[in-house]
Amino acid sequence: NLLQFAFMIRQANKRRRPVIPYEEYGLYYM
């Protein structure tokens, strides 16, 4: 699901580096 995927990325982003993968994934998925 997109919601679960986004949530997982958000958690990983919070624990990991800045919002770099989130933007990339958002561009490809959203």
UniProtKB/Swiss-Prot annotation:
Expressed by the venom gland. One of its GO terms (molecular function) is toxin activity. GO terms for biological process: arachidonate secretion; lipid catabolic process; phospholipid metabolic process; regulation of muscle contraction. Its EC number is 3.1.1.4. It is an enzyme of class 3 (hydrolase). InterPro entries: PLipase_A2_dom_sf (IPR036444). Keywords: Calcium, Hydrolase, Lipid degradation, Lipid metabolism, Metal-binding, Myotoxin, Secreted, Toxin. It is found in: Secreted. Binds 1 Ca(2+) ion. GO terms for cellular component: extracellular region. It comes from the Eukaryota. Its main location: secreted. It catalyses: a 1,2-diacyl-sn-glycero-3-phosphocholine + H2O = a 1-acyl-sn-glycero-3-phosphocholine + a fatty acid + H(+). Its cofactor is Ca(2+). Snake venom phospholipase A2 (PLA2) that has myotoxic activity but no significant neurotoxicity. PLA2 catalyzes the calcium-dependent hydrolysis of the 2-acyl groups in 3-sn-phosphoglycerides. Belongs to the phospholipase A2 family. Group I subfamily. This is Phospholipase A2 acanmyotoxin-3. It comes from Acanthophis sp. (strain Seram).
